[in-house]
């Protein structure tokens, strides 16, 4: 897969999606019993632009927010890492949020036998009200230049306007020679499988890199994976590989398929690894067995960030999947959806470094 050389464009990567405010009880508390809530910033697509900015890449965010102090939390968060927000459309705030608002999610971090839980409060958000033409994609991709566009199924699921906007973005990106990655990211609270397949099958012909776990490919593209239990807690990689071969046969434009492999032992202990298909060959990452987790939300976005960083910096496919797995593992050691990892830490773990204290 050929990626534009560094320095050929204003942006190494841009993400298109919604960014929300996440409210979480401290520790492993319950929402209904917590007198205080921590404020975090995150969104499935935004998280990738933020992570790569922390790794030294030139990134930008494409979205729509409403112009009020809550949105400024998001803008300040992006700017703090160097994420360009010049293509974020700001809607006028009506003082109440009847027309546009900032999406919220309430997330409990599970432990033991109790799973993590996310409750959405994102209806009628500014991002979900986006329409084609609100963002000038040709300016971003053709005039300013962008090497890589990342978006995904969470944003496409929010509304018909979001799905149409994603299609416009993918069309403009391909016309400009921009690599497109798309995280299938199925969320049953946002849409059903039938609608997901209807929308996504129109998008895949414009996509270079597909990211998704076994459930994503089943629910979003209709491909079955043999050997998965009803709780989706274990996966036979041989069955996954067979499914990927069907995917790339159906969509020959797809050059990369990647996923994380998570086996849940408890709310805070998982076995973690990743697998990548690149132009006919499969690559498997180092395994992180018994990975101790602080907060699993955003782990998949961490993988997407790491492998995109690898391709953008000219690494081999094996190095790309190892970078993705390492970054995803590291991201889950901290609270919040977005990366708190720098390039030195990523390189240390990617090269097999241990958690021995550094003095």
Language-model-detected regions and their locations in the chain:
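Conserved phosphate/ATP/ADP-binding segment of small-molecule kinases
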Residues: 176, 190-281
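Short catalytic helix/loop segments, enriched in acidic residues and glycine
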Residues: 28-50
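Positively charged, low-complexity intrinsically disordered leader regions
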Residues: 1-31
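Conserved post-catalytic alpha-helical subdomain immediately downstream of the catalytic base
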Residues: 267, 283-353
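Alpha-helix C-terminal capping segments
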Residues: 40, 47-59, 80, 310-313
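Conserved N-terminal subdomain of the carbohydrate kinase-like
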Residues: 58, 62-153, 346-359
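Charged helix-capping and loop-helix junction motifs
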Residues: 135, 163-168, 194-201
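Short beta-strand/loop segments at the ligand-binding rim of alpha/beta enzyme cores
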Residues: 177-184
């Amino acid at each position: 897969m050929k990626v534009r050389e560094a320095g050929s464009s204003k942006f190494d990567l841009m993400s298109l999606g919604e960014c929300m405010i996440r409210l979480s009880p401290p520790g492993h508390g319950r929402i209904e019993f917590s007198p205080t809530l921590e404020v975090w910033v995150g969104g499935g697509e935004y998280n990738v632009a933020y992570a790569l900015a922390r790794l030294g890449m030139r990134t930008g965010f494409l979205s729509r927010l409403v112009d009020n102090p809550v949105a400024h939390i998001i803008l300040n968060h992006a700017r703090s890492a160097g994420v360009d927000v010049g293509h974020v459309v700001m809607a006028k705030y009506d003082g109440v949020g009847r027309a546009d608002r900032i999406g919220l999610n309430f997330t409990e971090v599970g432990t033991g036998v109790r799973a993590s839980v996310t409750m959405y409060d994102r209806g009628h958000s500014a991002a979900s009200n986006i329409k084609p033409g609100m963002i000038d994609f040709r300016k971003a991709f053709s005039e300013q230049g962008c090497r890589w566009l990342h978006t995904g199924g969470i944003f496409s699921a929010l509304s018909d306007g979001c799905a149409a906007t994603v299609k416009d973005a993918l069309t403009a990106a391909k016309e400009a020679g921009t690599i497109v990655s798309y995280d299938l990211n199925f969320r049953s609270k946002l849409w059903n499988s039938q609608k997901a397949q209807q929308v996504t099958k129109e998008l895949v012909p414009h996509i270079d890199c597909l990211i998704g776990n076994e459930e994503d490919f089943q629910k979003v593209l209709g491909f079955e994976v043999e050997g998965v239990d009803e709780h989706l807690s274990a996966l036979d990689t041989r069955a996954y590989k067979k499914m990927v071969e069907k995917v790339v046969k159906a969509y020959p434009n797809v050059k990369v398929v990647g996923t994380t492999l998570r086996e849940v032992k408890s709310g805070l202990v998982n076995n973690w690894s990743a697998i990548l298909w690149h132009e006919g060959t499969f690559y498997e990452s180092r395994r992180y067995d018994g990975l101790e987790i602080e907060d699993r939300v955003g782990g998949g976005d961490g993988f997407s960030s790491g492998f995109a960083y690898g391709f953008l910096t000219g690494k081999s496919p094996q190095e790309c999947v190892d970078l993705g797995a390492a970054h995803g593992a590291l991201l889950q050691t901290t609270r919040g959806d977005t990366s708190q990892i720098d390039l030195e830490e990523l390189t240390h773990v990617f090269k097999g470094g241990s958690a021995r204290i550094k003095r």
